Amino acid sequence: MSEDILTYTANTDSDDSDVEQREIEKKYKTSSETPVVQLYDGDDYDNDDIRETNGNDFPNEEDESNQLYSPVVDMNFFTLSDECTEVIICLEKNQHLLICGQFNLQIIKGGITYNNVHYNSGYKNWEFWHPACNAISPIVSSFYAGWESKLFLNREYQHFTTQIESYDCVLKISNGCNITELSSLLPELRDMWGPLNISLLPGIARKQLTFNIISKISDSVRILDISTEWSTVIDEMRIFHANSSQDMRVMVIGGKNSGKSTLMRLLVQKFLHSNNDLSYEAIHYLDIDPGQPEYSPPESISWNKVDPKSMSLGQHLCQGRFTTIKQHFIGSSSPQDWPETYSNAVESLLKEWQTENFMGTSFLNIPGWIKGFGVKIINHALDHFKPTHIIFLSYNGLPFSSEIKVPDAFSTTQRSTYKPIILQLHSPAVGKHISHALQRFNAAKIRQFKITAYLHKKYDRNFVINPLVMQKPQLTSIGNRGIVGFEFLQYSNSSLYHDDIKLSLDGTVVALHRADSTPDVLFKGIFPVMKNYSKINTEFVGLALIHSIDLEQSLIYMYIPENLFRALRETENKWVLVRGKTETPICELYPNNGIFKSEVDIPYVSLYQKKRHEHVWKVRKNVMRRGHHMK
């Protein structure tokens, strides 16, 4: 292939069954106008389309500061309980409300717009997730889109009616789950759910609430500003989604910090919540990015179903409300560690999804890797996902690699033969001066938080706040009725020495797989090590943290999330334990609350230091230097 940029036109003849697609394509910018398969090889962040700004870059700062909500007790802010876990917020016309944290929101009067989607007042509670590690979308007051505006206020709060009647929009904000307290285990992420130096109101302690109102622009919080270009494309794609009688498959391609996940989140929200009367149609979300997943467990890929009535708004850090249909454990945040394992898992997941013959809308979230092996991942995903819509996100119009090959047409059971619609959008500009507080929220730290949240999750969607070393582990046997096989992805099982297996497992995160039958194993001590893991049919169920192993009793003690442990207890299966490269959060091995009073008490951690000159001496032979001669 030459280095010329591949171009595609939207008016090429296609299958007769795709008449509606040809009509809608006229609304899109085609690649005959803008090249889409290009030679991207840079990190220029000077674009200015959709901005994830810090507070100092808030658009129209003077105007917005006047519109930014600031609470005043007994005027536009009312507490509903002695515990202050519920508050009423009154907004004037077009006023912006910025909230960090995890909370539930009910629109008592009027309406709101959130990410350019309108929501009417009603008794429904919406679940919001606004961590400070991501740009926060403002909640903007709006009107009631209906014949007659109503006041959706419970009986016990009717005495507030006269105090709130003069406001255009009235909201009830209540506490969410206690995930905001979980950051206390990770000191470097202690302000992940909002700046610590901001107090809500006099008399209300920060620990009383799972959310925090931002009443003053700060460089500790980024604000999401959606560009006109993005809004136009999102609206046009929503029309296609609403009017299509066939399936729709969306794939977004972009590098790191390109806004790929943000755009897909906005599209999902627009598709599911555009109408005030929520439909029962769900969206399928295929998440094959093990490093920064949207829905998958840590270092895994998954196929999920997102329902419009229960969908979580904002960045839920894989803790929102959704249904997982299928998942595969990768064992690493990078597909490059075991490329064959990753490719096989992706292909298996997409094939299982294809058999569903889903006629709705599906999204594919791929890694933000557009060079080297990342190009192979993109091409592999294109071949198997067969998208109807492909969006390229580039910085300042910089081209992508010419090795990304988009087929001229795809063929599926649902659509026969069709030509993909290809769009190119600009990525958001990244602030050149990011505050020290925001610099801590890198991908590795967020992965550690997700692993911690996963392991601490309870059945009722709350979280265990104390370190796991202070909890009682669950007991599982090693043998025919428990764990029937061990697999180590990093090492060859045949090269393992049985005395080293216990040490290599203590205090590590492992994956539990359900096996259909007893695998072919080789016993090394008490450990049944798999001979050929790829030949046995297993199903990934979830992650666990190993507390300890009793070699004499052939028992293994593990911390298993409460919601997962109930499922394991209800079924009698054979289990295979897989160890990858997943790192255990340091807060699980050595909590910062001072529970270990002396060095002797600390498990998993060796404080031994070699004495001076205590090391292995290696004699160097035949080292030839200038002036040296062999005799």
UniProtKB/Swiss-Prot annotation:
GO terms for molecular function: ATP binding; polynucleotide 5'-hydroxyl-kinase activity. The keyword Membrane does not apply. One of its GO terms (biological process) is cleavage in ITS2 between 5.8S rRNA and LSU-rRNA of tricistronic rRNA transcript (SSU-rRNA, 5.8S rRNA, LSU-rRNA). Keywords: ATP-binding, Kinase, Nucleotide-binding, Nucleus, rRNA processing, Transferase. InterPro entries: Clp1/Grc3 (IPR045116), CLP1_P (IPR032319), P-loop_NTPase (IPR027417). ATP binds at residues 254-261. Residues 19-30 have a biased composition (Basic and acidic residues). Residues 1-65 are annotated as: Disordered. This is Polynucleotide 5'-hydroxyl-kinase GRC3. It comes from Kluyveromyces lactis (strain ATCC 8585 / CBS 2359 / DSM 70799 / NBRC 1267 / NRRL Y-1140 / WM37).
